[in-house]
Structure formats: C-alpha cells, structure tokens
Amino acid sequence: MKQKDFQNWSVMRIFLSYFGPHKKLFILDMCCAFLVAVVDLIYPLVSRSAMYDMLPNNAYRTFFVVMLIVVLAYVVRSLMHFIITYWGHTFGIRVEADIRQDLFEHLQTLGFDFFDRNRTGQLMSRLTSDLFEITELAHHGPEDLFISLATIVGALIVMFTIEWRLALVVSILIPIFILVVISRRQKLGEVSRQVKAKVAVITTEIESSLSGIRTAKAFANEDVELRKFSEANDRFRTSKRRFHREMGIFTAVMEFFLSIMSVAVIAVGGFLIMNGQLNYIDLITFSLYISAFISPIRKLASFAEQYAVGLAGLQRFTQLMRTEPDLRDAPDAKTLSGVRGEIVADHLDFAYDGDLDVLHDVNLHVTPGETIAIVGPSGGGKTTLCQLIPRFYDVTHGSLSIDGLDVRAVTQHSLREHIGIVQQDVFLFADSILENIRYGKPSATMAEIEEAARRAEIYDDIMAMPDGFHTYVGERGTLLSGGQKQRIAIARIFLKNPPILILDEATSALDTITEAKIQSAFDALAKGRTTLIIAHRLSTIRNATRILVIENGRIQEQGTHAQLMALNGIYANLYTTQTKLRT
C-alpha cells in the first residue's frame, strides 16, 4: 500500500485492503462459516419434521436415516470448525505480518526528529499489543459477524414460514438490541482507546526501567523505579476496570434481552395455543430457534467488544502510518556517486523544531581529503553540525553540499552510503561480534571482517574470547567493556570504507595505550578521505589539517594547532587547561 493511500483512505478501507492478498483464505473461512450456519439452522427443522411426520406415521427407517444424515452433517460442521480455527488464524497471522511489515518499514523512513519526540516503549506497543488486537479483529470479526447475521436472518425466515406472529415478536426485539449494541459499542471504543494509551505508557515504563536497570542499581533507586511503575500500573488498572465495567453493562443488557425474547415467545406462543392457533410442536420448534439465536447474539456481543478494541488499535496504527517523514527525497533526487569528499556549508543556520537555535551563520569549506578537527565547549553545536552532513536533520537556512550537490538534492540512501560515522554513544545490536562488525558491509567476507577487526585493534580481544567472533555481545553490548564496544564500532567503519568519515569522540572510551595504537590506524584510514573529528581530548587532534573551534553555535576560530595557540584564544585556553589537568 502506498503512503498516499493511508492519507486518503478511511481507517476501515485501509484495514480491508490487507485482506486482498489473502482473499482465497478469507473466502474459504467465510464459506466454512456459512456451512456452519446452515447446519445450525437445519436441526430445528429436522426435529419439527420428525415430530410432525416421521414418528406419528411410524416411519422409523426414514427417521434413523435422517438422524444418520444429521450426524454426518455435524461431522462436516466439525471439519468446518477446524478449517475456521486453523486457516482462519493463518489468515489473521498473515494480515498481522503484512501490517507489521508496513509499520516497521514506515518507521525506517521517519527521521531522527520523530524518534526524538516519541518514546521507544510506545512504538513497541504499536508493533505488538495493538497489532495483536487488529489480528483478532481480522480473523474473528468478519467470521463472527457473518455467522451471526446468517444464522439470525436464516432463522427469522424459517420462523416466518412457521408462525408469522411469533416471528414478528422476535423481529421487533432484534432492532432494539442492535440499537443497544451500537450505543454501547461507542462507549466501549472510547474506553478501549484509553486502555491502549495506558498500555503504551506501561510498556514505555518497562522498557525505560529495564534499559536503565544498571543506573537504578548504581543509585540504589530500585524503589523509585518501582514507584514509577506502580503509578503507571495503577492508571492502567483503573482504565481497564472502566472497560470491564462498560463490558459488564453490555453483557447484562444482552442477557436481559435474551431472557425477554424467550419469555416473549413462550408467552405469545402460549396465548396462541390457548386460542387453538398454534400447536405444541411449532412452539417447541420456535424455542429451538430461539436457542439457536443465543449463540450468534453472544457472538455479536463478542464482536462488539472485539471491534471496539481492534478499532482502537487500528486507529493508532493508521495514525502512525499517516505520520509524514520529516525528511523526504526530492522527486528529482540524484544518486550520489564517485564522491571526492568536498563539503561546503554556506550561511548555514539550524534550529531544532524550528525554534531551538543551535547553529548560526556557519560558513565552511572542506576540501577533499582534508582532516578537520572540531572542538569547543559542550553544547556548542559540534555534533549537530556533523549530523547535518548525512542529513539526519535538514538545515533551517542556508545550504550544505557535498561535491557541489546540495544534500537535499540527492537520495538519503546514496548520501549515507558514502559516509561512515562512529558516534559518541556506541550502539551494538544484541547479536554476535561478527554480525555487529558485518553491519558496516553486509556482503563482507570473513577475511574482510577479520582485517577490519585487526585494523581497529580488537582482533586479539575477540580471539581471546571462548566463542571468538561468534561471542554474544548482550543487550546494547553490555557484555563487553566500553573500549571493546568502541573498537567494534570503529571496525564497522574500516569495513564500510567510506570516502567521508565522521568520528564523534570515537576514541573517548579507549585507554591511553589502545588510543595510541588506534590513532595510527585512523591516520592511515583518513589518507585520501575527508575526515571530521569531534574531540574533547585536544592532544589527539594536533596533526589535523585544520581545527575548528565552535562555541555558541558559531565557528569562532579555525586554523592549525600552532596558529590557534598563537592566537591565544578559546582553543589555546582549552588546550592549556587540559595540559595542566594531565600534569
């Protein structure tokens, strides 16, 4: 489904569109449901025929043949139920998988700005809890609705052929019940949306607490986390109680309706018998059909709850799918290729969310192969400037270009293919060391991965581990030391081998000896490539081609180490302060 379809189509049309690729299974499910309804309708008629004709006329042979046919019909009914249960759930799972695939693919298109504003736990709830409810609606919803309506309509038709006055009583009561269902469903839907929101909150609290469990234990704040979770859990429990209260009212009304229907049929039927207008056999047949009504009506009640819950999840899914990416490729975007590495910022301004100013009138020209070190006080805009180069965010004013092409004029994929980044906060996937390094180049051979590990000074550490490259790194790499995580991230970049490098405190977690070893590897890697290094340890960037000093979102100074020391400005002050601290 295309993105524009989510913008233009109704929620229900979006939902039904997922049935299309699996319509054969859906049709099979509906056909089996129809056969189940037919068998349920036949039994009262067979009973009536037996009492009217077969037994009074001593047609015992015919009676037992009919009973055998009924047994066979119920065998077929059981088979139909198996198909409904097995293949119906298979249909639901396939719909769920398609929806989840679309949602995950859409999340991949959203920019940093979206994830800055939304918590991971809430997104996890959309991908799991909400989709489960949508799946249940996809499978059971149409099936329950179809069986119920087919049984009710079929039963009414038969009842009108038996005694129209009794059938009229039932027909009058059914619309009243439908009105009650509609009114209560709206209330159920409102409460269900509140429950969904609370589930997302509690999922977020769990994700946050488990991710930060080491921090909580380090501060002995387990009680604080428990209190935060308990508060979220209480809010969830309250919303769930409201939902069950509404469901309880609905169920009570439904059971009352069913009882009134039975009483009304017996009362009117009894009156007709007293006046010689109805016999006992037809009243018994009617009672059997009233019993046949109970199951589909209960299914309708179940459908009302399922629809309310599933629709709430469906609305949340659609809302997320309608979220436009902050960054889009231009319709005529070019594929960036043959990158030399020239970077030009022309009167560049940037503000987060359009109002939090970070960079002001930045002018910068980086020639191909130049190594630029970016230093300055924390919060000055160093990392932000480097995040604009791979277009994680768009500039607010001015322009940023690579090899003369504005980064907004090329595809994001081709742009980022030519840039290698080692971020300050290293993220490793919960997988093996091998797969984490291979992430830099999914098609890499084992020999290439081993060479990248050697150049990143992590090979010996890996081989000393019991499982070598197949060692599991833990959640976010928690089973490795900080330096090991950093070097695995660096190995990814060696493997990717891009023409532009961005190193954001890439050696910050390394000890002095390892840092010294890897610095020469960085120097070798930087040859012939454009390299931007964000550094707080000024001693590591003395050999940079040029050093930029960024403070308060502006380039305040630039030059070589010697030139900036002679200037005796911000850089000289930072360098002198660090030198004194080391001694």
Name what the model sees in each region.
Residues 1-40, 55-66, 84-92, 99, ...:
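Membrane-integrated ABC transporters
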Residues 221, 245, 293-320:
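Cytosolic ends of transmembrane helices, especially the final helix of ABC transmembrane type-1 domains
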Residues 2-5, 93, 101-133, 204-228, ...:
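Short intracellular "coupling" helices and adjacent cytoplasmic loop segments at the cytosolic face
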Residues 42-44, 48, 73-76, 142-185, ...:
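A hydrophobic transmembrane-helix motif
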Residues 329, 336-583:
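ABC-type nucleotide-binding domain
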Residues 69-76, 206, 253-256, 260, ...:
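Hydrophobic transmembrane alpha-helices
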Residues 21-24, 112-113, 129-138, 142, ...:
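An intracellular "coupling" helix at the cytosolic face of ABC transporter transmembrane type-1 domains
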Residues 20, 26-80, 160-165, 276-280:
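Transmembrane helix-loop-helix hairpins at lipid-water interfaces of multipass membrane proteins
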